[in-house]
Regions:
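C-terminal, non-catalytic "cap/extension" segments appended to globular domains
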Residues: 2-32, 38, 42, 226-228, ...
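His/Asp/Glu-rich acidic catalytic environments and adjacent acidic regulatory segments
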Residues: 2-42, 46-47, 93, 100-302, ...
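Membrane-entry segments of alpha-helical transmembrane domains in multi-pass membrane proteins
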Residues: 28-40, 63-70, 264-268, 307-314, ...
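C-terminal non-catalytic alpha-helical accessory regions
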Residues: 44-139, 562-574, 578-594, 601, ...
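Short, hydrophobic/amphipathic alpha-helical patches that form generic packing surfaces
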Residues: 79-90, 148, 152, 254, ...
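Active-site-proximal, well-structured secondary-structure segments within enzyme catalytic domains
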Residues: 142, 146-147, 185, 189-230, ...
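Short pre-active-site segment immediately N-terminal to the catalytic Zn-binding motif
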Residues: 463-482
Length: 692
């Protein structure tokens, strides 16, 4: 036992000093939850101190002494404390949260929003920025973009408002920030609260062995007998696709599609309504008629009219085929169930699978044995090597935040260090559903000319391994991996001076191009042959099976397109509101996407209350971006199809002109530099087999 006067080494907050880790990676093992709040508050204090120095600088404002310092990525310190702690905390909140994290997020959200407002609404600071904006020297394209972004960022945050307007804006943005956080926390709790517990093995009828094993493992982990199914995609999707138990499918479907609507503390209905109104008020306070007008100024689409044109063009092109696809499903169901059978939404995946089996003799479970996760990783990494010459080396020296996470060092084709890549593969308690890419550190060039390399992370919810089998993925999960890996390449290839313009820091309707571009490879036979080997026998996937994958790529493609379009219509319906939004969410939703719907709508289901993208994920008035980027990716990939899907010269052009440039120039300028022309919808229609 130590005596009271024993001198002990005082523990230091890891965020306050150099990490002294490989590549300055996050020392997760040394970070305690109390470190976050301390670092947030100290980071705010340091920011305030730097801003005070800046506004009192006696020298005339210049690009270097004002804009670069405001950008806060190339300051005197080699890192920005507030940015440093924020990136780690944000990742943990979505990938490895707990009640303490949630409570801290609730506490810090208004404090951080207030600080952001204090910066953007600082009159003396804006005067310096405005002076540079109006009196700057000749700038490079990247410097001009940074200056424009800086000035516009302050104006769009209320710098030109009077004091009363600024105070009103503070209140609106702080409330919106808190409600967005509440929305996400409610949704996560709703998602994790529901389970379908089965103890009668007969009720597993139709389910493949992989789904049964995963459910048995879930039950075991929950100290329950039998089998446990959840609303996480790797559990939910196989049940809806294969289970012959129609009533259980209904229960699972209704649980997932009514999240956030129940009479409990996790209800999101009023939160959604309030967020729509808050964003409209913010936009109108800043001189825009609608929130969509406010957002689309800095998008390739430019305005709501162009967004609606894209969505309506897609409806016109795809709807006839989508209607026929649904009729084919209904015929398939009636052949089995009789002419009086009425297909419900919880039957859709089940009969879609049956129809796919009849037409192509293909189903996800046939493919799983060939998509062992470790082999898929090799295939995806190998694709990057073949295209760009980069290589990946797993590192046990780089700390991770959970045992599921793997860390890799990435090296460029000349052998130089390129990036750190983290991969977090499987669902677990405290982890949000879905898949996303994030960064623990961006890329920039510091004052000494050192190219600081990025640390990127992809977070997914792929099928878990069981006691009997390794993680065996579906083709859809392989596609998800490729999608997020495309985002990560955008981050890893970043090569810009300023971090705020690097990697994925681009306009939102351009950001999905690199990710959706990579999805194209999931049905390319030459790529599949590089890694699709049976996990037991080592035999390659038979050519006949690969051919069936390629032939079936457009199965239900028109329906899938209209489903995405419907989400885009819903998003635009909310954020083109000019007056106070007072409608009931659920009926409003049904009306908003009606023209894109080709299947039955249920009165109680609701997408809005779980639509994280547009309520809490930055895609408000921007969900159309997925279809916009799909036009771009189909057009871009057509060049690879012409020159060879592994053509290194084409890949180098894609890297040099798009992936490495970030947001340093207008996206269309970058795209045309790669493609030689603006994109058209033709390549997308051709890829999907749609004729106009």
């Amino acid at each position: 036992m130590l005596e009271n006067n024993t001198t002990q080494t005082e523990r230091k907050n890891p965020f306050f000093e150099p990490y002294n880790t490989p590549h300055d990676t996050v020392p997760f093992n040394r970070i305690e939850i109390g470190d976050y709040e301390e670092a947030f508050l100290e980071g705010i204090r340091r920011d305030d101190e730097e801003i005070e120095k800046l506004v009192n600088d006696p020298e005339a404002p210049t690009f270097e002494n004002t804009i670069v310092r405001v950008d806060n990525e190339n300051g005197e310190n080699y890192y920005d404390l507030l940015s440093r702690v924020s990136t780690v905390f944000s990742c943990m909140l979505s990938a490895e949260t707990c009640d303490e994290f949630d409570a801290l997020a609730q506490k810090m959200s208004p404090i951080l929003t207030k600080h952001a407002n204090d910066v953007k609404l600082n009159k003396r600071l804006f005067e310096r920025i405005k002076y540079v904006y109006e009196n700057h020297r000749e700038l490079t394209a990247e410097e001009q973009m940074l200056l424009d972004n800086c000035y516009d960022g302050f104006v769009r945050s209320g710098a030109l408002l009077d004091d009363e307007g600024k105070e009103r804006l503070r209140n609106l943005t702080e409330e919106a920030s808190l409600l967005s956080l509440q929305f996400s926390q409610n949704l996560l709790k709703e998602n994790k609260a529901f389970t379908l517990h089965i103890t009668d093995e007969a009720q597993l009828d139709g389910l493949p062995e992989t789904a049964r094993e995963a459910a048995a493992l879930a039950a075991k982990e929950a100290d329950k007998e039998g089998w446990l199914f959840t609303l996480d995609y790797p559990s939910y999707s196989p049940f809806m696709t294969y289970s012959t138990q129609r009533e259980l499918r209904r229960q699972l479907y209704m649980a997932r599609n009514t999240e956030g609507t129940h009479d409990n503390t996790e209800n999101n209905l009023e939160i959604c309504k309030r967020l729509v109104n808050l964003r409209r008020e913010i936009a109108q306070l800043l001189g825009y008629e609608t929130y969509a007008d406010y957002v689309l100024v800095h998008r390739m689409a430019s305005n709501a009219k162009n967004v609606y044109k894209l969505l309506n063009d897609l409806i016109d092109a795809y709807r006839p085929t989508a209607v026929e696809e649904v009729k084919a499903l209904e015929r398939e169901a009636k052949q089995t169930e009789g002419d009086d059978f009425v297909m419900e939404p919880w039957d859709f995946s089940f009969y879609s699978h049956k129809l796919q089996m009849r037409e192509y003799n293909l189903d996800a479970e046939m493919l799983r044995p060939y998509f062992e996760l470790s082999k898929v990783i090799d295939g995806v990494f190998g694709l990057a090597t073949r295209l760009y010459g980069i290589t990946f080396k797993e590192s046990k020296d780089i700390q991770v935040y959970h045992p599921d996470v793997k860390a890799y060092e990435v090296f460029d084709k000349d052998g130089s260090f390129l990036a750190v890549f983290y991969a977090d593969f499987h669902p677990r308690k405290g982890k949000q559903g879905g898949a996303w890419m994030t960064e623990f550190q961006g890329q920039w060039i510091d004052r000494k000319g050192v190219n600081v390399r990025p640390h990127v992370s992809v977070v997914m919810n792929l099928t878990k391994p069981t006691d009997e089998k390794p993680a065996l993925l579906t083709l859809g999960e392989v596609e998800t991996f490729l999608h997020e890996f495309g985002h990560s390449l955008h981050g890893m290839f970043a090569n810009t001076r300023f971090e705020s313009l690097s990697g994925t820091n681009v306009w939102w309707d351009f950001v999905e191009l690199p990710s959706q571009f990579m999805e194209n490879y999931s049905v390319e036979k030459e790529f599949l042959r590089t890694f699709a080997f049976h996990y037991k026998t080592g035999e390659p996937m038979p050519d006949d099976l690969i051919e069936r994958i390629v032939r079936s790529r457009n199965f239900m493609a028109a329906y899938a397109c209209l489903r995405q379009v419907s989400f885009g219509l819903l998003d635009m319906a909310y954020y083109t509101q000019k007056e106070e939004f007072a409608a009931d969410i659920i009926p409003f939703e049904k009306k908003a996407w009606e023209k894109a719907m080709v299947t039955k709508q249920l009165p109680d289901t609701c997408m809005t209350t779980q639509f994280s993208h547009i309520m809490a994920g930055g895609y408000a008035a921007g969900y159309y971006s997925y279809k916009w980027a799909e036009v771009l990716d189909a057009d871009a990939f057509s060049v690879f199809k012409k020159n060879g899907i592994f053509d290194q010269k084409t890949a180098q052009s894609f890297r040099d002109n798009i992936l490495s440039k970030g947001g340093t120039e207008h996206p269309m300028t970058l795209y045309k530099r790669f493609r030689g022309q603006e994109p058209t919808i033709d390549a997308l229609l051709e890829r999907n087999g749609i004729k106009r």
